[in-house]
Amino acid sequence: MKQQENQEDLFMAGVLYGVGVGPGDPEYMTLKAVRLIRENEVIAVPGPVAEETVAYKIAVQAVQELADKELVPILMPMTHDRAVMEQNHDEAADTVEGYLKAGKNVVFLTLGDPTVYSTYMYVQKRIEERGYHTELVSGITSFCAAAARANTSLVEWSEQLHVLPAVHKLDSELDLPGNYVLMKSGKKMGQVKEILRRSGRDVVMVENCGMDTEKVYHSVDEIPDDAGYYSLIIAKEAKE
């Protein structure tokens, strides 16, 4: 009997949507992302104060009524401590589950695309393990948008593309065939620039892609050592 009640509760439960809002320009948001934000009242936003997060500031420009929704801040601290991360992801899932149990959908905003290095996925996995339905809504990735802003391609013909998530894991000399994307490269820019110079690759960097403070640099020498957190580098094989 209890199992039947649990199944009925899940049948009546809300759905968790992981919605990508793109890298910065609200015009990059998809029609589906805009519709889901408009149609649902509970919006989860990664950060201690929802209104101060980058994801919220992007989305509210495209969906002004977002300001009147029930905003749920979700703490996602930047840490490499596995135990701390696990605890925060569990607590985030607990918060989301409270709304799903009450039959409310939750739209969880995430920068770029939720399938690319998004902490949202850790929450989704926990929600799915608890038996709830989830759905991913694609957004434009930062590296696709950055390539467009730099007016260049990422790959052509049969070229390979290597996407590296963070500079602290950059321990190679970029010597694999194909082109590289270095995400969130600002923390150790001096080290990154030296590796780029040695590689002999053609380099472009977009800082704060799609935002009011966006800047595009077309060579290693142009890139400042104090570039910001949202700095994305595209390093392409030099053309002979």
PLM features: what roles do these ranges have?
Residues 16, 174-240:
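A contiguous loop/helix-start segment that scaffolds small-molecule binding in enzyme catalytic cores
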Residues 115-176, 224:
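Class I SAM-dependent methyltransferase SAM-binding "motif I" and its flanking Rossmann-like core
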